[in-house]
Amino acid sequence: MTRVAVVVPVYRNAATLEALVARLGTALAGRDWRLRLVVDACPSGSAEVALRLAATDPRVAVTGLTVNGGQHAALRQGLADEPDADVWVCMDADLQDPPEAVPLLLDRLGAGDVEAVFAGRRGAYESWLRRVTGGLHRQVAARLTGLPPDAGAFLALGPAVRSAVLAAPASPSVVLAVGVARRPVTSVPVARDVRPEGRSAWTARARLGQSVRSLWWALRRR
């Protein structure tokens, strides 16, 4: 049976972790799966919830980072910490990435003609301004790397793409690292949900800085 590792960065997500585990368990019933929660030096109680879940469910493991490196550094660490899987899924902890879509990504990856499958972003899941600016970023990323123009950080990836991501530790973005690897990828449309709790840790300034750094990194590798 294919071994699936789901890698999730955690920062200020204490309120959604229990639901995340429960919904993944339902969505992945009948599959061999494991959840790697990467707590990104979160000061607000997420680590305690993650450790409690790991203590009661052997499918849940926790990586605790002592320095906050951001979403993409946490994803990279989580991928590195799950070497025994056959396929990997990266997703957010805030439930905007619906766990019920994970089998869709895995099944498309299992068709064998691509090495990564992105959840193509759909829906009114954040403010119009964030959707517009995020869409512009993804359009430029697509022009630079050949990524699908709706690609975000909810994706399933195979061994070659995981290796490419881990071989690019300086990349500010796991998504752009996948694009620069020039492996065959695709996307399937997935409606994102409105965040049920809290707000994004990404401020407008942080989003802009991340976009500029990651696009410049990709441009230099064309």
Segment roles from a protein language model:
Residues T66-V67, Q71-D81, P99-P172, D193-R205, ...:
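Acceptor/aglycone-binding surface of glycosyltransferases and processive sugar-polymer synthases
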Residues A85-Q96:
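Short beta-strand-to-loop acidic/aromatic patch adjacent to the donor-nucleotide binding site
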Residues T16-E18, S44-L53:
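Acidic helix N-cap motif at the loop->helix transition within catalytic regions
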Residues N13-A27:
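Short, well-formed alpha-helical segments that are part of the catalytic scaffolds
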Residues R31-C42, T63-G64:
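Short beta-strand/loop segment that forms part of the nucleotide-sugar
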Residues A170-S171, V175-D193:
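Catalytic donor-sugar/metal-binding loop of nucleotide-sugar-dependent glycosyltransferases
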Residues R3-A5, R34:
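Cell-envelope/extracellular polymer assembly enzymes that use nucleotide-activated donors
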Residues V39-E48, L95-Q96:
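A conserved acidic beta->alpha catalytic loop
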